Amino acid sequence: MPKERIVAPSKEFAKLANVSLKEYKSKYKESIEKPEKFWAEQAKRLTWFKKWTKVLRHDFAKAKVEWFVGGKLNVSYNCLDRHLDSPLKNKAALIWEGDNPDESKVLTYHDLHREVNHFANVLKKFKVKKGDRVLIYLPMVPELAIATLACTRIGAVHSVVFGGFSPEALLGRIEDCKPTLVITADGGYRGGKPIELKKNVDAALAETKFKVNDVIVVKRTGDEGNLNWKEGRDHWYHYLMKDPEVKKECPAVPMESEDPLFILYTSGSTGKPKGVLHTTAGYLLGANLTFATIFDYKDTDTYWCTADIGWITGHSYILYGPLSNGATSLMFEGVPSYPDMGRFWDVIDKYKVTVFYTAPTAIRALMREGLEHIKKRSLASLRLLGSVGEPINPEAWEWYYANIGKSKCPIVDTWWQTETGSIMISGIPGAIPQKPGSASWPFYGIQPVLVDNEGVELKGKGEISGNLCIAKPWPSMMRGVYGDPKRFFDTYFSQFKGYYFTGDGANRDKEGYFRITGRVDDVLNVSGHRIGSAEVESALVEHKSVAEAAVVGFPHDIKGQGIYAYVTVKQGVVTNDLLKKELIAMVEKVIGKIARPDVIHWAPGLPKTRSGKIMRRILRKIANNEFDTLGDISTLADPSVVQSLIDDKKKYHS
């Protein structure tokens, strides 16, 4: 494969595209030079109850940002009500495809509006009011979308927790955000197997110091025999929705632009997950504009983002981006491998999906299966592909382009974060020529800069690598870490003064294309999901046999990054496969299966400085078989540990 292949948009695609290269350059220039004028114009895309008095007020050095000051609007109104006086009323808003291929459901905008209004009044019955937190721990079922939108309708702050997280992970989130109530399901399905949800909620609530008085339970599996039902606390969703005393109509509450919208927890470089706080107007505008522009949205599209709503990708590009544009968004409960490895392609053909947005991890897993399943399907409806969650390697990009897009669909390789709220760097289909493996150019209003380790901006027109920062505020950026302003400032604004620090490294070539090179902190990107090394280490040392643990990432064929755990056991403990299984089970219990280590390397000791700091740089190199580039290890407290780890790596983990 040529080192730097450039794929220009086809004339056919470019002719119908929403944005041309000339228009992109003009709009981008205005968005950087006259940001307030640009964003005031874009804000007309939303419906406001009251117009703002000031577009932007900020002190970036102090992490203070406010957009559309004085304005009032409602997210639910923008996603539902404003579409009802048009033909969109009877258009499919959500297409739900169950884990079982025989289960599906379509909700029009009228249907979704009705259900959201009704459930918003159920929430009000439980005294949920503006500013209260509601924790949602549901599978990918329509009730998840209904619950989030109902929260936004009455001004409650939702916090969706991915259904794969353990009771202990759930407990930490409950104690941090202190929800008025919890919404869960009796269970769920994943790959044909039932998964426990209410049981996990019960376990978390049994341990919490914060009392949750009410739990609303969606009936999904119907396995009532195994439910630990708590009268007075637990309430069936379907009974509540049939309650004749609950009104059907619920007015959308006018919200200030900067009112909190949702909290979404993400891993940090320290053990405790961060509650990323997003606010109303800026977030919605970011999701709305990026969806319409980057996915070249047409009103005839059937759009499918394969993410879970438990992650930011699902928030922005299953719910808020598509629905605020009046799009048809597909919501998928299942996995790409069930009932066989052709499931994604079946769903695309079944619903004539036109825009498909998935993760490199899924692409690599499907790539490994060969072309057998693809040849049995048409995929002719597709016109645009997307990639999200981690950098896509050029080999996977080429496979995706040739075999799924049939060499005619552009690929938007999108870089962004939970914290950024919406896509930051991406190709614009039909406008920007693509380079496999590159996230391309910045979106409107985004001013990325590369800085060295001292915070000095790296300028020049040649190829440059450095720490990726953002120089100016943008509407959809997070406004804080919930309940912890110091952590917000320390994490994102203290390391490089005057910049938002992404935690990623990047390379910029002479044409201005960005390639994301990965995390530069102690956060792992596993299958597109962020996992803090400290979280996994803390889980491992909970085991009575473990004295110490250090976790690093290593290249993984499918996941992008795998989890490599160095474990030192206590004196007298015998290391064996049974203990490895116990440690993996411990991590699954504390965090969830998503964080299970791929490799457990028994370590006689860990390389430390004389002050006791673990040298993770050395551990990463050993995990990556880079034994010849360790650098000077003579200053370590015990340099002999390094050779011992290398010998074991060659012997047991090669």
From Swiss-Prot:
Reaction catalyzed: acetate + ATP + CoA = acetyl-CoA + AMP + diphosphate
Residues where N6-acetyllysine is found: K613
Residue numbers binding CoA: R190, G191, G192, K193, T313, S527
Gene Ontology annotations of biological process type: acetyl-CoA biosynthetic process from acetate
Group of enzyme by EC: ligase
EC numbers: 6.2.1.1
Cofactor: Mg(2+)
Family affiliation: Belongs to the ATP-dependent AMP-binding enzyme family.
NCBIfam families: Ac_CoA_lig_AcsA, PRK00174.1
Primary role: Catalyzes the conversion of acetate into acetyl-CoA (AcCoA), an essential intermediate at the junction of anabolic and catabolic pathways. AcsA undergoes a two-step reaction. In the first half reaction, AcsA combines acetate with ATP to form acetyl-adenylate (AcAMP) intermediate. In the second half reaction, it can then transfer the acetyl group from AcAMP to the sulfhydryl group of CoA, forming the product AcCoA.
Name of this protein: Acetyl-coenzyme A synthetase
Organism this protein belongs to: Leptospira biflexa serovar Patoc (strain Patoc 1 / ATCC 23582 / Paris)
UniProt gene name: acsA
